[in-house]
Amino acid sequence: MHLRHLFSSRLRGSLLLGSLLVVSSFSTQAAEEMLRKAVGKGAYEMAYSQQENALWLATSQSRKLDKGGVVYRLDPVTLEVTQAIHNDLKPFGATINNTTQTLWFGNTVNSAVTAIDAKTGEVKGRLVLDDRKRTEEVRPLQPRELVADDATNTVYISGIGKESVIWVVDGGNIKLKTAIQNTGKMSTGLALDSEGKRLYTTNADGELITIDTADNKILSRKKLLDDGKEHFFINISLDTARQRAFITDSKAAEVLVVDTRNGNILAKVAAPESLAVLFNPARNEAYVTHRQAGKVSVIDAKSYKVVKTFDTPTHPNSLALSADGKTLYVSVKQKSTKQQEATQPDDVIRIAL
C-alpha cells in the first residue's frame, strides 16, 4: 500500500507539473501572438505603410470635450505612438495611396476628406464633399469608407445616406471629379479592383453594386439574398485573383462569399453578426470583426470555415494588414454610449499570423 501510495503521489505530481507547463506554454504563445496597447479615445480605421514602416490610427477623441481628433502614427512592431497629428476635424475612415504616400481620412461629421503626407504628417489639403447645411429636412451625406487607386491617383469615398453616392476625388489636386449617384441606402461597403477597373459597393438594401472605374458608371446591381429577411451588407473585401468578394452582414450571423463576375453566392460562412472584413492573399484567409461578440474570426478561404477565433473585447472595430500579410492589426473600442462615454482610451491589437 505504501509503495502504491508513493507511486500515485509522484504520478499526480508529474501530471500536475506537466499540465502547468502546457498552460504556461500556451500562455507564452498567446502573449507572443498578440500585443495590445491603449492609444486614444474614439479609435476607428487604420492605414499601413511598408515604405514608412508605420501604422496610422484615426481617432475622433471625446465627443463632448474635444472639438477635433488625432491621427496617431504607431510603430508597427511595438505599437508605441511615434507621432500625434492633431486635426480640427474628427477623422474616422482611413486609407493610403502607397505610390504617393498620401494618407486619406474621412471627416464623417463634417462631410469632408483630409489628405496628409505620410512622411511628414503635414496636411496636404482638405475637400468638403457635401456643403449643405444640416437641418431637420436636410441631412448632408457622410463619408464612410475610402479606397485609393495607386495607379490613377484617385480616391473613392462612399457618401452614405438614405440615397448614397460615391465621391470620386483627384488625389493630385484634391478636387472632386464626379459623384456616382444612386448607390442605395447606406452604401457603406467599398472595395477596388484597380487592375480590373472595377469598384464594388454594398448597402442596406442588400445589394452588391459593380461600377466601371473607366467611366464611373454602374454596370450592375444585384440583391444578394431574397429570403425575406433584413440584411445590411456593411463591408466588403476582395480576392481579385479568384474574383471573389467577402461581405459582412451586421444583421445576420453569416459572412457571404460572392462571385464578383455575376453576384452569385459561393458560400455562407457561419459567424456572429459582423463589421469589418479583410482578405489576406498571402495566407488565403479572411479576417472579420464581430463588434457585439467581441471577437475576430479567421476564415480559411479554401474551405470557407472559421479556423480560429481571437477574443478581442470589448468592441473590435477595424482591420489592417502588414504588406507581407504576416501581421494583422485590430482597432478595439471600449464600451461607450451617448449618455456615458468611455473613461479609458481605445486599443490597437497586433496579431502575429
Swiss-Prot record:
A Gene Ontology term for the protein's cellular component: outer membrane-bounded periplasmic space
Entry GO MF terms: DNA binding
Inducing factors: Repressed by Fur.
InterPro entries: Haem_d1_sf, Host-pathogen_enzymatic-act, WD40/YVTN_repeat-like_dom_sf, YNCE-like_beta-prop
Range of residues in the leader sequence: 1-30
Keywords assigned: Signal
Domain of life: Bacteria
Self-association state and partner proteins as the record states: Monomer.
Miscellaneous: Preliminary crystallization indicates the presence of a single beta-propeller domain that contains 7 4-stranded beta-sheets.
Name of the protein in its database record: Uncharacterized protein YncE
Species for this entry: Escherichia coli (strain K12)
Gene assigned in the entry: yncE
